[in-house]
C-alpha cells in the first residue's frame, strides 16, 4: 500500500513537472517586425550570475610503502599496477605544483597561450574579423582570467605555511568545516576519505605481507573504482594546466555538489534553482588545482551565484533587410546589430551580445553578467520604433544582398534576395511556402525545415504564439545614391548624419555649379552689351557721315556778277 501511494505521489510530481514545463514553453511569444526584419522572443526568466562562491576540497592520501608481496597471482599484479598508477598520479600533481600555484601560473601565462593557440587554430576565421570584433573576441578569452580571480586568490593562500594543516585540523572530526584563511577569507572546506580509508584499512593489510591474502577479483575492482577518481582528477588538471571547466563529477560528485549548494549563503529559491539545474551549474563552474603536501591534495571549486533570478528575459533575432526593386548588384542593405539576450536587472537592462554564452534550460536563461552590457530600458524602443529619439539603435549597412535564414525560438526569419530560391517545408507535405524577394517570417506551425538556396535549416519545435507585425521596410526610406555602405558598427543617427552630409555636399556642389553658370551668363551679357554699343556707335558714325555727305551735295553754286555778265553777253552776241 505504501509503495502504491509512493508511486502515485511520484506520478503526480512527474505529471505536475511535465505540465509546468509545457505551460512554461507555451508562454513563449514571438513578435516579428517586418519593418526592421527582426523578431523578439519573450517569455523567458532570468538566472544571472553576479558572483562566485569558492570552496576547498581535500583528498587525503595514504603512505604507500614499498610492498613486499612476492606473489605472481594475476590479481596481485593488477593491484600492483593500480598502486603504481596511484603513485604516478600523485607525482604528476606534485610536478604540476612544484614551482607555483597552477592557477596563478595559468592566470599569468596560460590565458595568453590560449589566445595564441586560438589565433593559430582559427587563422582563417580570425583574418576575416574586423578590428573591433577582434578586440571583443580577445576580451572574451581574457574574461576567463577575471572569472577565476577569486578562486586564484584562495589557491595562492593555500601555499602559505600552515594553511593546509589548518584545514586538516579543522576536518579532524568532521567532513566539512568553515576555515578562516590568513587573508581573512572564510571558505567552506570538505574532505574525501573514501580512497584513503580503503587503501589504509582494506588494501595495504593484504598486500604488505608475504602471503598476499587477495582471495577474489572484487578487491581489485573496488580499488580500481575508488582509485579512478584520483586518476581522473590528475588527468584533468594535467591536461588543462591546473584549471578546468566545466566542473566534472570527478572533481565534485552530484551528492557533494548538492550538499555544497545547500551550504551556500543564498536564498532557498536560489538553492532550488541551482539544485534543479546542476548540469548548467557545472558548465559555469571551475576547479583550480592548489597544492599537494602534508599528504593532502587540495583544490578550489568555484561555483556561480545567481544573484538575479525570475526577471523577464527576451532574445532578439535579426536578419539583413535589403531593397529589391533595383538592378542586381545595386541594392542596399541594413541589419540590426543589437541581437542577443536581454534581461531586466534592477531598473536597467543587462544585454548579452554573445547569445551563445547564455545557457537555456526550458524557459530559464542562465547568463554571466561578466559578458553583459548595462543598457537603459529605452533600448526596447528599437523594436517598435527604430527611429526613436530616446535611444540610438545599432545597425550595420552594406550593398551586398546575401540570402540567409535565422532560426528563432518558434519560427524562422528568411532574407531572400536575387535569384535564390527560398522555401518552407513540412516533412509530410513537402514545400508549403515559397518566399518572394525581401524579408519574411514563418512560424513553426506545420513547418519543419526552411531552405535558402542549398542550405537547409531545421526550426525549433517549442510551443508558443507568433505575431506578425507588418510595416514598410525602413530600407525603402533611403536613397541608394547617398546610402553609406560597409558601416559595420554604426547607429541610425550616425547613418542619417552621413546621409545628411552627403546631401549637404550635393547641395553645395549644385550651388557652386549654379554660381559658375550665373557668372558665365553675366559675362556673356556684358560682352553682348559692349558689342551692341560698338555696333550702335559705328552705325551712328556712319549715319553722321552720310548726313554730312548728303548735306554737302545739296548746297547751290553761287556765280559772281562778272560770270553772269559774260554769259549774258554771249547770249546777246549771237
Curated annotation (Swiss-Prot):
A lipid is attached at residue 550 (S-palmitoyl cysteine). Keywords: Cleavage on pair of basic residues, Coiled coil, Disulfide bond, Fusion of virus membrane with host cell membrane, Fusion of virus membrane with host membrane, Glycoprotein, Host cell membrane, Host Golgi apparatus, Host membrane, Host-virus interaction, Lipoprotein, Membrane, Palmitate, Signal, Syncytium formation induced by viral infection, Transmembrane, Transmembrane helix, Viral attachment to host cell, Viral attachment to host entry receptor, Viral envelope protein, Viral penetration into host cytoplasm, Virion, Virus entry into host cell. Disulfide bonds join 37-439, 69-212, 313-343, 322-333, 358-367, 382-393, 416-422. It comes from the Viruses. Residues 1-25 form the signal peptide. The chain crosses the membrane at residues 525-550. Residues 551-574 are cytoplasmic. Residues 76-96, 158-209, 481-516 form a coiled coil. The keyword Coiled coil applies. InterPro entries: Fusion_F0_Paramyxovir. Glycans are attached at residues 27, 120, 500. GO terms for biological process: entry receptor-mediated virion attachment to host cell; fusion of virus membrane with host plasma membrane; symbiont entry into host cell; symbiont-mediated induction of syncytium formation. This is Fusion glycoprotein F0. The gene is F.
Amino acid at each position: 500500500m505504501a509503495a502504491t501511494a509512493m508511486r502515485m505521489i511520484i506520478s503526480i510530481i512527474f505529471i505536475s513537472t511535465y505540465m509546468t514545463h509545457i505551460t512554461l514553453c507555451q508562454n513563449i511569444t514571438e513578435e516579428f517586425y517586418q519593418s526592421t526584419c527582426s523578431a523578439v522572443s519573450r517569455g523567458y526568466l532570468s538566472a544571472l550570475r553576479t558572483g562566485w562562491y569558492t570552496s576547498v576540497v581535500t583528498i587525503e592520501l595514504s603512505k604507500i610503502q614499498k610492498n613486499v608481496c612476492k606473489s605472481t597471482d594475476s590479481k596481485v599484479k593488477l593491484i600492483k599496477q593500480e598502486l603504481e598508477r596511484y603513485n604516478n598520479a600523485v607525482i604528476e600533481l606534485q610536478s604540476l605544483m612544484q614551482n607555483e600555484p597552477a592557477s596563478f601560473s595559468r592566470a599569468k601565462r596560460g590565458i595568453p597561450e590560449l589566445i595564441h593557440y586560438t589565433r593559430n587554430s582559427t587563422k582563417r576565421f580570425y583574418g576575416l574579423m574586423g578590428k573591433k570584433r577582434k578586440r571583443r573576441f580577445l576580451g572574451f578569452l581574457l574574461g576567463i582570467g577575471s572569472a577565476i580571480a577569486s578562486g586564484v586568490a584562495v589557491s595562492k593562500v593555500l601555499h602559505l605555511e600552515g594553511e593546509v594543516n589548518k584545514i586538516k585540523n579543522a576536518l579532524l572530526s568532521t567532513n566539512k568545516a568553515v576555515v578562516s584563511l590568513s587573508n581573512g577569507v572564510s571558505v567552506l572546506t570538505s574532505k574525501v576519505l573514501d580512497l584513503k580509508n580503503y587503501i589504509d584499512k582494506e588494501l595495504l593489510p593484504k598486500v604488505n605481507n608475504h602471503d598476499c591474502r587477495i582471495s577474489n577479483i572484487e578487491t581489485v575492482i573496488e580499488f580500481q573504482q575508488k582509485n579512478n577518481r584520483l586518476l581522473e582528477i590528475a588527468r584533468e588538471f594535467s591536461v588543462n594546466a591546473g584549471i578546468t571547466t566545466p566542473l566534472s563529477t570527478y572533481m565534485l560528485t552530484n551528492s557533494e555538489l548538492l550538499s555544497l549548494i545547500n551550504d551556500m549563503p543564498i536564498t532557498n529559491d536560489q538553492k532550488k534553482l541551482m539544485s534543479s539545474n546542476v548540469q548548467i551549474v557545472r558548465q559555469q563552474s571551475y576547479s583550480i588545482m592548489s597544492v599537494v603536501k602534508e599528504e593532502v591534495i587540495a583544490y578550489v571549486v568555484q561555483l556561480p551565484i545567481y544573484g538575479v533570478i525570475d526577471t523577464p528575459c527576451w532574445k532578439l533575432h535579426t536578419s539583413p533587410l535589403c531593397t529589391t526593386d533595383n538592378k542586381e548588384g545595386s541594392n542596399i542593405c541594413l541589419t540590426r546589430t543589437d541581437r542577443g539576450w536581454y534581461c531586466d536587472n534592477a531598473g536597467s537592462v543587462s544585454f548579452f551580445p554573445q547569445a551563445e554564452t547564455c545557457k537555456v534550460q526550458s524557459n530559464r536563461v542562465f547568463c554571466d553578467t561578466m559578458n553583459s552590457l548595462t543598457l537603459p530600458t529605452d533600448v526596447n524602443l528599437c523594436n517598435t520604433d527604430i527611429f526613436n529619439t530616446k535611444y540610438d539603435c545599432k545597425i550595420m549597412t552594406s550593398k551586398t544582398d546575401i540570402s540567409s535564414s535565422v532560426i528563432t525560438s518558434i519560427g524562422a526569419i528568411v532574407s531572400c534576395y536575387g535569384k535564390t530560391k527560398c522555401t518552407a517545408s513540412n516533412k509530410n507535405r513537402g514545400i508549403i511556402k515559397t518566399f518572394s524577394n525581401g524579408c519574411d517570417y514563418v512560424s513553426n506551425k506545420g513547418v519543419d525545415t526552411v531552405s535558402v538556396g542549398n542550405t537547409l535549416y531545421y526550426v525549433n519545435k517549442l510551443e508558443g504564439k507568433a505575431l506578425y507585425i507588418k510595416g514598410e521596410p525602413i530600407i525603402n526610406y533611403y536613397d541608394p545614391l547617398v546610402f553609406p555602405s560597409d558601416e559595420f558598427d554604426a547607429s541610425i543617427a550616425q547613418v542619417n548624419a552621413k546621409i545628411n552630409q552627403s546631401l549637404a555636399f550635393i547641395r553645395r556642389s549644385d550651388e557652386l555649379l549654379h554660381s559658375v553658370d550665373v557668372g558665365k551668363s553675366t559675362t556673356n551679357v556684358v560682352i553682348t552689351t559692349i558689342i551692341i554699343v560698338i555696333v550702335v556707335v559705328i552705325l551712328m558714325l556712319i549715319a553722321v557721315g552720310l548726313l554730312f555727305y548728303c548735306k554737302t551735295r545739296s548746297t547751290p553754286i553761287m556765280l559772281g556778277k562778272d560770270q553772269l555778265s559774260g554769259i549774258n553777253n554771249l547770249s546777246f552776241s549771237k
